[in-house]
A protein has these predicted regions:
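Membrane-embedded alpha-helical bundles of multi-pass transporters/translocases
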Residues: 2-193
Length: 193
């Protein structure tokens, strides 16, 4: 009987670990919704920028992402043994927050540069955060395919409240980098426990 209790307790603790690991999905999904929906809508209405330059800036950020993901992935895999995962996670969220702040507080007369820098910061932040975060997911699953499925399921399931949060931020508030930073810190904290 005691063996069954221990197994159940261990199983429940693993589920709690998977849930805590997945909490950053909420602010990340919120940020992605904000960037992909609000930024094009806002910048396309600025006379100097327009829809064409807005699309070009976002496409440029995706091309940069396509190039940097494998390079940073290889680099981070080599550096994780020396520095650990948390360092790279700590770089990622501030980059995302700085990028969002730049996007929603463009400098007068420098809207195009603000747009380009903002989407590049956000994209690099997602790369610096996502690659190590996914690596942590593999590590906590202990290479068990059933646990890996649970980790990914929790992580992706928590993107749903993140999408809803992002939509609320767009609809009900004046979005700024400070709001996202506060939300990020709140949901990022379980990773550092």
């Amino acid at each position: 009987m005691q063996l069954g209790k221990n197994k159940l307790l261990k199983s429940n603790l693993r589920l709690v670990t998977f849930f805590l690991y997945s909490l950053p999905s909420i602010p990340l999904a919120a940020a992605q919704i904000v960037v992909y929906i609000a930024v094009p809508a806002i910048y396309s209405k600025i006379a100097v920028v327009g829809i064409g330059i807005t699309g070009l800036a976002i496409m440029t950020s995706r091309v940069i992402d396509m190039i940097t993901d494998p390079i940073l992935g290889t680099f981070l895999d080599r550096m994780v043994e020396k520095i650990g995962w948390q360092f790279w996670l700590l770089i990622g969220f501030p980059l995302i927050s700085i990028g969002i702040f730049i996007l929603f507080n463009p400098l007068d007369g420098l809207e195009i540069i603000s747009l380009l820098l903002g989407v590049i910061f956000v994209t690099l932040g997602w790369t610096f955060f996502s690659i190590p975060w996914w690596g942590i997911g593999i590590a906590i699953s202990n290479s068990n395919s059933n646990d890996r499925f649970k980790v990914v399921s929790f992580r992706e399931l928590l993107t749903i409240p993140g999408v809803i949060l992002g939509l609320f931020l767009i609809h009900f508030s004046n979005i700024s980098g400070e709001i996202f930073l506060i939300i990020s810190i709140l949901f990022l904290s379980p990773l550092f426990i």
